[in-house]
């Protein structure tokens, strides 16, 4: 038997990729160009297809040599990601984290998406390492090394390796809060001032001499304690410490949809969240908000009357159990606490903003279902009337009805991109079908309910005015009626059988000649026989009080000549009131 020879070159794949990267930088042997906002990047199809599912689908069955990416992709960000595909290394500034993460999610580069959490936490800082937490001021400005805290205060320590629920489980043992210049704070693990400037280090030893321990009240997932509310001299530390500001977070443009807040019951306990499923999260979060309506916060309950205290209850974050189901595919800001009214840019660079509370509502209601998430986002940005007047696409008007204009393409594309980042397998064709279906449902609801609203209004009234938000307090009447006199119209239609719809419509449309002269009170009578086998009683009341059920009507009824085998139809009589009050059939 011949002897087998085995040759193995260490890191041969990395060497080949390095050579391909050099060829790319020199523009040699590149077979595709990726155009981003007019800037072309040469690359190799095989390398891009091996790194990105997006490019794999794009190149499949397409032999073009140039492809253009959407305008939401920044060229500088794509250049960094392209270099990552060849080298496996990614270097970026702290302010570019969100942009890179969203671009990588759009391009479906799983290596960057899966390591997104580590990428957000591993940010080099002169004030932060594995044992310390960085201190930031309220304005999110980088702090100078010379800035020091007061020696009698200590910061609240948050570590990326410790989940949010563990950080919030602090027992309530003391009701009285010390003054601002009082002793330091200590939780389950005492805090002491470390050797660094103004940095609190969590140790197992006792606190510094002269510091009295103080246990913070117990809080839920939606309220991580902020010492800035208790002791004004202590600066607030957001979680996670790596990310300071998101692109566009400083500008707060208005949106069409109102802000939604979450008001949790004071007696709710942390353990209740552990056993909830995703549907219960959605019901719990929106049970008091209505349909994305602004709701005033209730009055705070005194500390003496409750055993559990929520500190900064307006700060919200995704529950830990929901994060364990969906992972880190949501907006990065949702994993840290923040004001529900804070404006978040849905996709970096898109200019489309949504409040934290609204976005959390969408995720809590959708859970792991990406199609439900798309519907919730569309319902947040577009009201039902806008959807009913639209065709569901952001490209062109409807071919069947040109009056149906497309939805705002900027908002629609941002929503699609966000949902695609949440579920990379979510195809755009499926999103278009869902958007068109929502528009169709909105038109169907409007078509079904507006005739019912019209039937309850007096004839001659524009029914669309009340639907579009106009006040229905003063309704315009027919100009032939005197406007100075108070006019009361009350009508009751009773049908023995529900199948007599034609009879009811005929009675509604029957014209009645009313004598409005100042002569004596004339009475006119109308007699009508219904051919449907059922009788219809039409009763018209004047401003006087209506008779109780069981009493005979004061109106004069004349009985028509009908056969004994068929019920007789009494007909209402309308009279002219001397004070100008009109009563008659409509």
Swiss-Prot record:
CDD domains: BTB_POZ_BTBD14A_NAC2. Residues 349-446 form the BEN domain. Residues 177-196, 236-272, 542-586 are annotated as: Disordered. It holds the Pfam family BTB. GO terms for molecular function: DNA-binding transcription repressor activity, RNA polymerase II-specific; histone deacetylase binding; protein homodimerization activity; protein-containing complex binding; RNA polymerase II cis-regulatory region sequence-specific DNA binding. Gene3D superfamilies: BEN domain, Potassium Channel Kv1.1, Chain A. SUPFAM superfamilies: POZ domain. Residues 30-94 form the BTB domain. GO terms for cellular component: chromatin; mitochondrion; nucleolus; nucleus. Keywords: Isopeptide bond, Nucleus, Ubl conjugation. GO terms for biological process: negative regulation of cell population proliferation; negative regulation of DNA-templated transcription; positive regulation of intrinsic apoptotic signaling pathway in response to DNA damage; protein homooligomerization; protein-containing complex localization. There is a cross-link at residues 171, 215, 297, 427, 454 (Glycyl lysine isopeptide (Lys-Gly) (interchain with G-Cter in SUMO2)). It is found in: Nucleus. Residues 247-261, 550-572 have a biased composition (Polar residues). Homooligomer; mediated by the BTB domain. Interacts with the NuRD complex. Interacts (via C-terminal part) with HDAC2. Interacts (via BTB domain) with MTA1, MTA2 and MTA3. PANTHER family: AGAP004733-PA, NUCLEUS ACCUMBENS-ASSOCIATED PROTEIN 2. Functions as a transcriptional repressor through its association with the NuRD complex. Recruits the NuRD complex to the promoter of MDM2, leading to the repression of MDM2 transcription and subsequent stability of p53/TP53. This is Nucleus accumbens-associated protein 2. It comes from Mus musculus.
